[in-house]
Structure formats: C-alpha cells, structure tokens
C-alpha cells in the first residue's frame, strides 16, 4: 500500500523521522482543537491533513520552540484582554441605556 504523501517527500521537509512524527502529532492536535487549516485537504483525518500541510511546506518546525510558546501565550493573553474590553463596553452600553430609560420615565 502506497501512502500519500510519501515518507521520502516528507523527510525532505524535516530533519528526521522523529521530528516528522512530533510535528505531525502537534499539528494534528492543533487541527482537532479548531486551528485554521492552511490549505484544502484530500484527507478526512487530522493526522493525514497534518502530513499534507507538512508536505506542502505550510507547517514547519519552529527554530526556537520557547519563542513560539511565548508568542502563543501572548496571543492568548491579547485575545483574553480584547474579550474583557468588549464585555466592559457592552456593560457600559447597557448601563447607559438603563440610565436613559430611567430619565424618560
């Protein structure tokens, strides 16, 4: 049985089989968790989708994993702060509308 993408083409993209397996597993978990895909897929399974992305060069090993983790944490924090700000604005708007409604009565 011939697998697509082939191991030979995948090993051209990453330095070792170990690195390939780790990269594929991490990307498959990201896809399962709802990460945006970088392309359209032929495969249904997230593990094979990850291999397709690796083959196309859309997913690569980050040269500095600790920097990537820090960037991910920073993005999560920025998203959290943006959500809190949006909720604060909504609460202010609701309070303002209630105040205006109270003045009309």
Curated annotation (Swiss-Prot):
Known Pfam families for this protein? RNA_pol_Rpb6
Q: Which UniProt keywords apply?
A: DNA-directed RNA polymerase, Nucleotidyltransferase, Transcription, Transferase
Checking InterPro entries in the record gives:
DNA-dir_RNA_pol_omega (IPR003716), Pol_omega/Rpo6/RPB6 (IPR006110), RPB6/omega-like_sf (IPR036161)
Task: Give a GO cellular-component term.
Answer: DNA-directed RNA polymerase complex
Q: Which reaction does it catalyse?
A: RNA(n) + a ribonucleoside 5'-triphosphate = RNA(n+1) + diphosphate
Report the SUPFAM superfamilies cross-referenced here.
RPB6/omega subunit-like (SSF63562)
In its UniProt record, a GO molecular function of this protein is:
DNA-directed RNA polymerase activity
Q: What is its EC number?
A: 2.7.7.6
Q: What class of enzyme is it?
A: transferase
Q: Name one GO biological process term.
A: DNA-templated transcription
**What family does this belong to?**
Belongs to the RNA polymerase subunit omega family.
Tell me the subunit arrangement. The RNAP catalytic core consists of 2 alpha, 1 beta, 1 beta' and 1 omega subunit. When a sigma factor is associated with the core the holoenzyme is formed, which can initiate transcription.
Xref: PANTHER family: DNA-DIRECTED RNA POLYMERASE SUBUNIT OMEGA
- Role description: Promotes RNA polymerase assembly. Latches the N- and C-terminal regions of the beta' subunit thereby facilitating its interaction with the beta and alpha subunits.
Q: What is this protein called?
A: DNA-directed RNA polymerase subunit omega
Source species of the chain: Streptococcus uberis (strain ATCC BAA-854 / 0140J)
